Amino acid sequence: MLTERQLLILETIIRDYTDLGQPIGSKTLQEQLPIRVSSATIRNEMAVLEKQGFITKEHSSSGRIPSLKGYRYYVDNLVKPVKIDSKSVRSIQSLFGNEYRRVDEIIEMSAKILSDLTNYTAITLRPEASDLKLEGFRMVPLGNGQVMVILVASDGSVESQIYNLPNNIDGESLEAVIRLINDKLVGSSLSEVTSKLQELQPLLTKYIEKSDGFIDVFGGILDKAIKEQFYIGGRRNLLNFANGNNLEQIKSLYSLIDDESDKIGGLVDNTTNPHDHHGISVKIGDEMSDRLLLDYSLVSATYNVGSHGRGMIAILGPTNMPYSKMIGLVEVFQKELTKKLIDYYRNFDK
């Protein structure tokens, strides 16, 4: 159990290290603390905090910096979210001000806005609704024996993929396939469509001699529509906080942000974090799955748009980020994104 004075010292070290980015010594603390304490007493208290693992010493300085344990304790017990002023809220609202035709456009834009506001890497996850339905199906001729297979979901999202037509299929057969899919599958939930599609294979074979290829393409588009879709803004902002002397870390981070499998997006999920702070989750350093991110923290929040599902927003930045400000900002941004999505769905559902 930390004493009141030790709590003040820990909080001041974290705040000053966030502002200055340099180890904090006893003289600096003596000037910053709201209570009068001798430099010797401060050094003794710092020794206690260091022994308990809340702060650590850098070899090149006599000052101290927060440890991951120190940050964790601070976020769980000491942080007070900054209230975002009305001018900043209006600024966020104006950045969201465009009209959108697809929900994915809103989610993609939110990642860019959040990244621009923080100068960190932002990750946004599209709402995932268990009762999403297949709203429409089309095949658009592209020429050279190819068509674009297009699925429209009930939330307005659109997925598509190119399909190479068999040599012997004609326009009449193609129209028959479109009618069959619309008659038998449109209106079903996306989770049901997968199994129903297999049941349709004997009928599809009447019009497409080798229907396996079509079913594979259709199934691939369904998978994209069902799985969690995320967007990343400011990928390269990660490099701003890398250790400039550690060439291997920089190379590995480059690999991480350019990874086609989007490992960054995989950091965000819809599970509850044991360190939730009034609906805001904070993961610090080794609490994330990737060892490359030991010097980073993830601040995330879930948003809920009722029957249209739940999604998530997050920022990935340095462990010495200003947590009070970032938690307050993420909280406000989550509310504004939710409002924007509710407005979108209200218009779409009419």
UniProtKB/Swiss-Prot annotation:
Query: Which UniProt keyword terms apply here?
Result: Repressor, Stress response, Transcription, Transcription regulation
- Source organism, top-level taxon: Bacteria
Extract the PANTHER family matched here: HEAT-INDUCIBLE TRANSCRIPTION REPRESSOR HRCA (PTHR34824:SF1)
Q: What does the sequence similarity comment in the record state about its family? A: Belongs to the HrcA family.
Q: Decide whether keyword Transferase is in the record.
A: no
User: What biological processes does GO assign it?
Assistant: negative regulation of DNA-templated transcription
What function does this protein fulfil? Answer: Negative regulator of class I heat shock genes (grpE-dnaK-dnaJ and groELS operons). Prevents heat-shock induction of these operons.
Q: Does the keyword Transcription apply?
A: yes
Q: Where are the annotated coiled coils located?
A: none
Listed InterPro entries = GAF-like_dom_sf (IPR029016), HrcA (IPR002571), HrcA_C (IPR021153), WH-like_DNA-bd_sf (IPR036388), WH_DNA-bd_sf (IPR036390), WHTH_transcript_rep_HrcA_IDD (IPR023120)
Which protein are we looking at?
Answer: Heat-inducible transcription repressor HrcA
Pfam families, alphabetized? HrcA
Which Gene3D superfamilies does the record match to this protein? 3.30.450.40, Heat-inducible transcription repressor hrca homolog, domain 3 (3.30.390.60), Winged helix-like DNA-binding domain superfamily/Winged helix DNA-binding domain (1.10.10.10)
List the Gene Ontology MF annotations in alphabetical order. DNA binding
